Amino acid sequence: MAYRKRGVKREDLPQQNERLQEKEIENNTDVTMENKDKNKNKNNNRKQQLSDKVLSQKEEIITDVQDDIKIADEVKKSSKEESKQLLEILKTKEDHQKEVQYEILQKTIPTFEPKESILKKLEDIRPEQAKKQMKLFRIFEPRQLPIYRANGEKELRNRWYWKLKKDTLPDGDYDVREYFLNLYDQILIEMPDYLLLKDMAVENKNSRDAGKVVDSETASICDAIFQDEETEGVIRRFIADMRQQVQADRNIVNYPSILHPIDHAFNEYFLNHQLVEPLNNEIIFNYIPERIRNDVNYILNMDMNLPSTARYIRPNLLQDRLNLHDNFESLWDTITTSNYILARSVVPDLKEKELVSTEAQIQKMSQDLQLEALTIQSETQFLAGINSQAANDCFKTLIAAMLSQRTMSLDFVTTNYMSLISGMWLLTVIPNDMFLRESLVACELAIINTIVYPAFGMQRMHYRNGDPQTPFQIAEQQIQNFQVANWLHFINNNRFRQVVIDGVLNQTLNDNIRNGQVINQLMEALMQLSRQQFPTMPVDYKRSIQRGILLLSNRLGQLVDLTRLLSYNYETLMACITMNMQHVQTLTTEKLQLTSVTSLCMLIGNTTVIPSPQTLFHYYNVNVNFHSNYNERINDAVAIITAANRLNLYQKKMKSIVEDFLKRLQIFDVPRVPDDQMYRLRDRLRLLPVERRRLDIFNLILMNMEQIERASDKIAQGVIIAYRDMQLERDEMYGFVNIARNLDGYQQINLEELMRTGDYGQITNMLLNNQPVALVGALPFVTDSSVISLIAKLDATVFAQIVKLRKVDTLKPILYKINSDSNDFYLVANYDWIPTSTTKVYKQVPQPFDFRASMHMLTSNLTFTVYSDLLSFVSADTVEPINAIAFDNMRIMNEL
């Protein structure tokens, strides 16, 4: 590239390029010859590399001419900008290091999840009533079963019985009670908050006048029965007449339905205990938080009247039922983290147009500090890290941390006096509780030993670790100056005031902070400190401190405005919080750089920034949805725990119940929650009362367990064990089977009692005396219709092992079915062989399907509309932000 320095003209460039190319090829050839003599083994490789190099140089010379001129211009421009961007780059580096440290710290917390995923999960929690019910709730369905003759051959006729829709037992577990617990859990998930039959009604295909039935399953059942050849004519005529009956004056409609009596009881209960309530404008008006309704900065309007059919479901906003802030450090940390991330997303941004120009402010600060005449390194640090991004980050962090009650930790350099002076403002306006104790002590100690004690010529404070008093509390007793002691007294007593507003515990700020008057108190203390002689320190040290105080005191008006702005935004967003704001120090903390506090203090302008009404409504809706879902999931968990207790599954299922509860809250990483907190959560949950609807549903299941067992193809109601083989009996539902339909003449033992007492002696004695014994209780069975396996495997051995090991819960008898559908039926028939078994399965006949008994008329409202987002009816706007009014009827920002 040396030819450029000799002033090559643009038109001569192609010729120059050719000549240079030739020279370079010659030179490179010489080099290759030398290398060949030195290193013969690598000759080919070296040639290839050099030829590639020559080609690449040729391309660079041809194409790079004008690019280099452009790059030179860019270098000149960037050299001018580098000095401006240097502070921003340093800040970015600091931020990166901070994020890395934060991630490392968070990985030690069991329930941590990435920020974006938590925010998405919170916003995705929607009221369950938003999904419409398109079918009635059903456990049973009618099914056609064949009829077998006395010799085991299938007839052409069929018979209808009620069978289970989902006949599934828990995998790998032979306890039927788990089936009922899972069934109850499924009902709780599917239990509708309201039913509108008009939404699910479908056309009855066999109707004479296009009538409708209640849902698609009823229609398909009617269709199957209508087409069955054995159906009576009167039933077909009845199906043809099935249709809805409307009573428009009462807003009522009746629909015909085909339901098992138990399913009918469930759906009748759902219809009679709907959670929907009438909705009108007054309810929507009262739904908006009162402080936002009364805020003069927001204009709210409702332009439409709601119809009489409007309905809504009142959110379940009960408070502190589990007290997760008390002794649930890991869970509480996750809740506060998710609340913090949500709050940060709604705190308004301080954009560059709302802040003072960073460049102009740094220039002004340099003039105030007389930096051109400086010889002291410490004062150049005053300007480090000041930028608009840091100011905005600090503003959002402070408000979001207070809204979520997240503990903050302070990061600072002791030699940066400007940071410490900004920290004095921070400690003045933010209550002490918000900071990690160790971090607060370190910051206070730095302020005392760097600024306060040197000003009065006092010796350095030697603070003892673990001292119940903070450095400021010790200093308050030792400093004689009234203004400084008064300021220290305010900070030492700066706590949140707990106030219950609209039934929610709020953490409110001191009135002196809300109106900004405390800043005058801070300035008086700072002025007193700057007037002191610093007798034990050099003159340069005194000058540095005084100039730092001067920089802050020059912005007295802006600091008052900033404090008022901070308080207003905090209180306005706090009105949208629905869960009690419990204050407990969190396991992890939010890092706050004191340089970012300096940025905020120095760059705050006179523009008022308040949350938009849409942001407030969004924040309120997310909080309501999470809180309501939280309470509903508590109700579910309490109901399941009670059910497990009554089904004698209490010890077995407890941890999985609590895990399911946490999973349904969406924000927890359940596998990483410590076991001690799981069991503590179980203890809290079991102390709560069961919600009425959930208790009634469980009682319905409990009363009808026998009917459900009868309808299952996998659950037996007992087993009969004999020492000698018993013949298989004929049954018209199955053919030849080892089924007993009643227990007449058998000695009976309850399986529950057997499991509880563990006394197997009675069974053994009865079997040895050749007396069959019936073990009564629900247990699963398997079906095996192969005669070969029947010969090969005597099922008595199954029970011999169980009696030996004393494990009734592994009992799983085999049901043998031999009929014309079986593979080996003709083998049995031809040889006239009568199969036998040492066991019989006790099972009652499932309930026959009777059309007349299964036809029910269900009644619901003809029509209503459920609205889940009540705030969508409210149109909202803000007044001119510059005139925004605070609680004391004065402008938030007075400094113009």
Swiss-Prot record:
- Subcellular locations according to the entry: Virion
Q: Pfam families from the xrefs? A: Rota_VP2
Top-level lineage group: Viruses
Q: What terms describe the molecular function in GO for this protein? A: RNA binding
* InterPro entries with a match to the protein in the record: Rotavirus_VP2 (IPR007779)
Positions of the UniProt region annotated as Hydrophobic: 410-430, 438-458
Please report any disulfide bonds recorded for this protein chain, giving both cysteine positions: none
Q: Which UniProt keywords apply?
A: Capsid protein, Inner capsid protein, Repeat, RNA-binding, T=2 icosahedral capsid protein, Ubl conjugation, Virion
Segments of this protein annotated with the region 5-fold hub: 1-94
Q: Which residues are annotated as site, described as Interaction with the intermediate capsid protein VP6? A: F238, M242, M855, M857
Where is the stretch described as Disordered?
Answer: 1-54
Any Gene Ontology CC annotation: viral nucleocapsid
Q: Domains: what does the record tell us?
A: The N-terminus binds RNA. It is necessary for encapsidation of VP1 and VP3. The N-termini of 10 VP2 molecules form a cylindrical hub underneath each 5-fold axis of the inner capsid.
Family under the similarity heading: Belongs to the rotavirus VP2 family.
Assembly description: Homodecamer; each decamer is made up of two conformers of VP2, called VP2A and VP2B. Interacts with a VP1-VP3 complex. Interacts with the intermediate capsid protein VP6. Interacts with NSP5. Interacts (via N-terminus) with NSP2.
The protein's name in its UniProt record: Inner capsid protein VP2
Give the organism the record lists.
Rotavirus A (strain RVA/Human/United States/P/1974/G3P1A[8])
